[in-house]
Regions:
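Cofactor-cradling patches in redox/metallo enzymes
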Residues: 120-122, 130-194
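Peripheral docking tails and interdomain loops at the edges
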Residues: 183-219
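Glycine-rich active-site/cofactor-binding loop and its immediate structural neighborhood
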Residues: 95-131
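Short, contiguous strand/loop micro-motifs
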Residues: 4, 20, 103-105, 127-128, ...
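Short, flexible hinge/linker loops that cap or flank conserved catalytic cores
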Residues: 93-96, 175
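Alpha-helix N-cap/loop-to-helix initiation residues
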Residues: 39, 67, 109-110, 161
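CheY-like receiver
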Residues: 32, 143-147, 210-214
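Long amphipathic alpha-helical segments
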Residues: 1-93
């Protein structure tokens, strides 16, 4: 409910959700997400709105408008909003077997896209493996050795992180365990599958679909 005591319409509430994430207000972000989802049977467009808000946060961080601490507060608010929406997130259920490790790299200001994909994998019937956040290429390879995944999914927000993924791919190419790498997110736009590391997808939803396809073909 707004300050005038009247309920907001959907468009206004959507803007409010974005504002609360940008302010890093966990309670208000969760409350806004709950309000928006109340009359809906599916909320994938709201998940997109949360992702868009975190892209704005990344932009503000890149131009030094947001500190690391502010980004962390925004990420926590986005995660609370995602938790509120989770019961109504709809993805295709699957019984496909396979090990999917999700990890984010250094030089990305946040790892919300990692959190989102892991949630969607769980909802879809997978058991995702947490490969860590803010990882160096060497740390990713160590995690690959430890967890032995079939697929390594890496969200990318910035081009700097994309460069780290290329280094990671190079290290993995000479490694004993060689998972198929799926890069996704706006930072992946600078990459090409022809560079030898696997697959490039636009967002978490398309990454999830590609992961399912890859595991089906493997099985």
């Amino acid at each position: 409910m707004n300050t005038e005591g009247f309920p907001r319409d959907s468009e206004t509430e959507m803007k409010h959700l974005t504002e609360m994430i940008l302010k890093g207000d966990e309670e208000q972000a969760a409350r806004s997400a709950e309000e928006l989802s109340r009359e809906r049977t599916e909320v994938n467009d709201l998940v997109d709105a949360i992702s868009d808000a975190m892209n704005i946060v990344a932009d503000l961080h890149e131009v030094d408008r947001y500190s690391v601490e502010q980004v962390e507060r925004c990420e926590k608010a986005a995660e609370r909003a995602l938790t509120a929406l989770r019961p109504k997130i709809r993805v295709e259920q699957t019984r496909i077997s396979g090990r999917v490790m999700v990890a984010s790299l250094k030089d990305d200001p946040h790892s919300f896209d990692k959190t989102l994909l892991m949630a969607m994998l769980e909802i879809g019937g997978f058991t995702p493996l947490d490969g860590g956040s803010d990882m160096s290429p060497q740390e990713i390879v160590q995690k690959v050795d430890e967890l032995d995944p079939d697929i390594l999914a890496v969200p990318l927000v910035t081009e700097s992180a994309a460069k780290n993924l290329l280094e990671t791919s190079h290290l993995i190419s000479s490694n004993r365990i060689k998972p198929h790498i799926v890069a996704y997110g706006r930072g992946a736009a600078s990459l090409s599958p022809q560079e030898g590391f696997g697959t490039v997808e636009e967002d978490s939803i398309s990454a999830l679909s590609r992961i399912a396809e890859l595991l089906i073909s493997k099985n």
